[in-house]
Amino acid sequence: MNIQIVTVGKLKEKYLVQGIAEYLKRLSAYAKVTIVEVPDEKAPEVLSDAEMKQVKDKEGARILAKIPDDAYVIALAIDGKMKSSEEFAADLDKLATYGKSKVTFVIGGSLGLSEAVLKRSNERISFGRLTLPHQLMRLVLVEQVYRAFRIVRGEPYHK
């Protein structure tokens, strides 16, 4: 399985870079996982609704340019479906079983995802109702993908 994670912004925090690198190393036994960063749109702290939409649209265009046409796209969104780790694992396994070998996860910037990206997505998932920094979400996602592969193969880790 080829898994791509498209995310907005450059990761600067060393502890997150190290954590993600560790999980990517572990994941290499199960899948090819790549992380693609697109530039975030510079914006002032306080934005009108129209300005927020404009920022999300610009970031969204950059995201969409990185998604392969044949990819199954999963957007991480606060309004997405919440799943247990076991459900997430089963769903990833089903994608592989039914020939969806290219899966792209999308993590938006601090303002979220554009409507165009959400429309391109095949599904939306949420890792809870908490708001997490999008940089931290990368680490959470790669850990959950790793956990999913361990669960599917019946390997110890997830308890």
Curated annotation (Swiss-Prot):
One of the record's GO molecular function terms: rRNA (pseudouridine-N3-)-methyltransferase activity
Protein name, entry field: Ribosomal RNA large subunit methyltransferase H
Bilayer-spanning residue ranges: none
Its biological purpose: Specifically methylates the pseudouridine at position 1915 (m3Psi1915) in 23S rRNA.
Disulfide pattern: none
Single GO cellular component term: cytoplasm
Organism listed in the record: Listeria monocytogenes serovar 1/2a (strain ATCC BAA-679 / EGD-e)
InterPro entries: Alpha/beta_knot_MTases (IPR029028), RlmH-like (IPR003742), tRNA_m1G_MTases_N (IPR029026)
Keyword field: Cytoplasm, Methyltransferase, rRNA processing, S-adenosyl-L-methionine, Transferase
E.C. designation(s): 2.1.1.177
Location in or out of the cell: Cytoplasm
Lineage per the UniProt record: Bacteria, Bacillati, Bacillota, Bacilli, Bacillales
Family to which the UniProt record says this protein belongs: Belongs to the RNA methyltransferase RlmH family.
Reaction equations catalysed: pseudouridine(1915) in 23S rRNA + S-adenosyl-L-methionine = N(3)-methylpseudouridine(1915) in 23S rRNA + S-adenosyl-L-homocysteine + H(+)
Enzyme kind, highest EC tier: transferase
Binding-site residues for S-adenosyl-L-methionine, renumbered to this chain: L76, G108, F127, G128, R129, L130, T131, L132
Quaternary structure annotation from Swiss-Prot or TrEMBL: Homodimer.
